[in-house]
Swiss-Prot record:
Residues 209-273 are annotated as: VHIID. Changing residue 232 to K: In nsp2-3; decreased size and number of nodules. Keywords: Endoplasmic reticulum, Membrane, Nodulation, Nucleus, Transcription, Transcription regulation. Signal peptide: none annotated. Interacts with RAM1. Interacts with IPN2 and RAD1. GO terms for molecular function: DNA-binding transcription factor activity; sequence-specific DNA binding. This is Protein NODULATION SIGNALING PATHWAY 2. It is found in: Nucleus membrane; Endoplasmic reticulum. GO terms for biological process: nodulation; regulation of DNA-templated transcription; response to symbiotic fungus. Residues 425-500 are annotated as: SAW. Transcriptional regulator essential for Nod-factor-induced gene expression. Acts downstream of calcium spiking and DMI3, a calcium/calmodulin-dependent protein kinase (CCaMK). Transcription factor involved in the control of strigolactone biosynthesis in roots through the activation of the beta-carotene isomerase D27, which participates in a pathway leading to biosynthesis of strigolactones. Belongs to the GRAS family. It comes from the Eukaryota.
Length: 508
């Protein structure tokens, strides 16, 4: 299996300009220094030294380089192993006792306070729904919760987590639940926007994203796994066309462009990003700006590259006929869903994209999605499973940056608070009946075939996790071992799976 040229990777720096280029033009001439992508973060406002952090794109490339440096000598000497435990994944039960023991309540000063918070949260959820619905009781419970919890940086994990769930329950009580449903979650946190100006909100969002990259493998795990699979799938192609469902700032594609550029005979890369008319000109302008930056970056490395965008319909439906296709291109569909920094996308929109992929017979479909619990029940059961899930997330963030209290709090406030509110709002409106199946399962049922994760890709994922706290682990599961799952201890957090259409099997 071909890996990227390590000498070329080691020569590549994004601190100001790249020393690896096939053209005499500097990065500055193209206006593509990756530092311009990174937020200007006032690290003095966070505890800890500024040197604990790196610029956004520097971090991505450096982590990719570190992983591959470790991976290269091990390909022929290492056997594939997947860390397993004798314990089954812990399932949430509907009783108070089993639920509270599943939630992390350590380091709260007094474990009884953590247990009390869990009991009160469950009671609040019960008071809002079902046969015991009592809005007056719910209001009293929430008042008590607000006296006990704190989103302050010095609050414990359980206190901060309970604060976000309390805010979400309060939104449901006041009829505002799910306000984050159909839009970018961090731009629709009404409380946040009323206490911070739009400019401050944008800066905090960028800073929070950079911090999330430094604190956890949540973003890089999916990006690196998908990119490595793409590199392997198109190794002998002359032209590659990637259709990206949710490109955002395009940070995923820096390492792919870099990898292709390190191969003198690499293919021409074309990326088509989907834009959403429902969010107005800002969405389209953001996609176009992303395209300009990626184009400049590719040019600085001498990588043949072109960028296009394709508008979704007003209801965010994808129409394959809207794509500009070129004969002979190897098609790749890339779908990142429900990651901490991404917007919620309606199931109908996602289904239209994946159905459209099937009609175009792509070489590869890369899917990264949040792992959901297999809880069967109504709102209360789903509420407690969500509490269990985010308890694991908060625990992992604290383990990654134990001394950076204010940094963690910013990430939690900008990304996870609105995400919790939006998720619970959707569950509440549907009575807990919101679709829970994974999109990977759906792909298998509609005729897609799993593509096995390569040994190199699996090793890369494990080595990436080695850069973070040892509580993370990776599992290889799925149809024909086509799926890698990122776990925090016993809780599955997100997965990356690889697919192709049955009719294209012979091409792989």
């Amino acid at each position: 299996m071909d890996l990227m040229d390590m000498d070329a990777i080691n020569d590549l720096h994004f601190s100001g300009h790249s020393s690896l280029t096939n053209t005499p033009t500097s990065d500055e001439d193209y206006g593509c220094t990756w530092n311009h992508w990174s937020p200007i973060v006032n690290w003095d406002t966070f505890t800890g030294a500024p040197d604990d952090f790196h610029h956004l794109m520097d971090t991505i490339i450096e982590d990719r380089t570190t992983v591959l440096e470790q991976l290269s000598p091990s390909i022929t000497t290492t056997t594939t192993t997947t860390t397993t435990t004798d314990e089954e994944e812990e399932e949430m039960e509907t009783t108070t006792t089993t639920t509270t023991t599943a939630i992390k309540t350590h380091e709260v000063g007094d474990d009884s306070k953590g247990l009390k918070l869990v009991h009160l949260l469950m009671a609040g959820a019960e008071a809002l729904t079902g046969s015991t619905k009592n809005r007056d009781l719910a209001r009293v419970i929430l008042i008590r919760l607000k006296e006990l919890v704190s989103q302050h940086a010095n609050g414990s994990n359980m206190e901060r987590l309970a604060a976000h769930f309390t805010e979400a329950l309060h939104g449901l009580l006041e009829g505002a639940g799910g306000a984050h449903n159909n839009h970018h979650h961090h731009n629709n946190n009404k409380h946040y926007l009323t206490t911070n100006g739009p400019h401050d909100n944008q800066n905090d969002t960028l800073a929070a994203f950079q911090l999330l990259q430094d604190m956890s493998p949540y973003v890089k795990f999916g990006h690196f796994t998908a990119n490595q699979a793409i590199i392997e799938a198109v190794a002998h192609e002359r032209r590659v066309h990637v259709i990206d469902y949710d490109i955002m700032e395009g940070v995923q594609w820096a390492s792919l462009i870099q990898s292709l550029a390190s191969n003198n005979n690499g293919p021409h890369l074309r990326i088509t990003a989907l834009s959403r008319t429902g969010t107005g000109r800002r969405s389209i302008a953001t996609v176009q700006e992303t395209g300009r930056r990626l184009t400049s970056f590719a040019a600085s490395l001498g990588q043949p590259f072109s960028f296009h965008h394709c508008r979704l319909d007003s209801d965010e439906t994808f129409r394959p006929s809207a794509l500009k296709l070129v004969r002979g291109e190897a098609l790749v569909f890339n779908c990142m869903l429900n990651l901490p920094h991404l917007s919620y996308r309606a199931p109908e929109s996602v289904a239209s994209f994946l159905n459209g992929a099937k009609t175009l017979n792509p070489k590869l479909v890369t899917l990264v999605e949040e792992e959901v619990g297999s809880v069967i029940g109504g709102f209360v059961e789903r509420f407690m499973d969500s509490l269990h899930h985010y308890s694991a997330v908060f625990d992992s963030l604290e383990a990654g940056f134990p001394m950076q209290n204010r940094a963690r709090t910013l990430v939690e406030r900008v990304f996870f608070g609105p995400r919790i509110a939006g998720s619970l709002g959707r569950i509440y409106r549907t009575g807990g009946e919101e679709e829970r199946r994974s999109w990977g399962e759906w792909l298998g049922e509609v005729g897609f075939r799993g593509v096995p994760v390569s040994f190199a890709n699996h090793c890369q994922a494990k080595l990436l996790l080695g850069l973070f706290n040892d509580g993370y682990r990776v599992e290889e599961v799925g149809v024909g071992s086509n799926k890698l799952v990122l776990d925090w201890k016993s809780r599955r957090l997100l997965s990356a799976s690889l697919w192709t259409c049955s009719s294209s099997d012979s091409d792989l």
